[in-house]
Amino acid sequence: MIVVIDTNVWISALQFAKGRGTPTLALEKAMSQDVNATCDEIDAEIVRVLTEKFSWERHRATSALQMILARGIRVKIRGTVKVCRDPNDDMFLECAALAKADLLVAGDKDLLILGAYKGTRIITPSEYLRAG
């Protein structure tokens, strides 16, 4: 199964994971059972949030991301999707569409409200953990 994971879930898993919270378990499931799809723009946003908002050293943020995405696939988005009520979230939809992702795992209400986009279901980390 191909999955795209939004920044909200990444940050919750990497920054706030004290033990075995839902975002951490979702990220672990994606790493061990599924294939993560990403793009340069998603990676840059994750690194930016970790370094600017949470004072991670850039090397630490980049290393964590590279290790997690080692089993993933990369797509090149063009920024042409204009669907989400928050334009900053359109990159997740475009990445999912180009990767032909089965799921977009999101904690962002602007994405979740859509329910699906071009064959990709948009679900919460809890729903992802319950999915086979």
Predicted regions and their residues:
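Amphipathic coiled-coil/heptad-repeat helices and related helical stalk/stem segments
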Residues: T22-P23, A61, N88-D89
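A secondary-structure boundary/capping signal
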Residues: D6-T7, T38-C39, G107-D108, T124
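Residues that scaffold the ATP/ADP-binding catalytic core of kinase and kinase-like folds
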Residues: S12-L14, V49, L114, A131-G132
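Acidic, PIN/NYN-like endoribonuclease modules and their adjacent C-terminal/linker elements
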Residues: K109-G132
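Short, well-structured N-terminal submotif of metal-dependent ribonuclease cores
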Residues: M1-T38
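PIN-domain endoribonuclease scaffold, especially VapC-family toxins
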Residues: L27-V83
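Active-site neighborhoods of divalent-metal-dependent phosphate/nucleic-acid chemistry enzymes
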Residues: A70-L104, K109
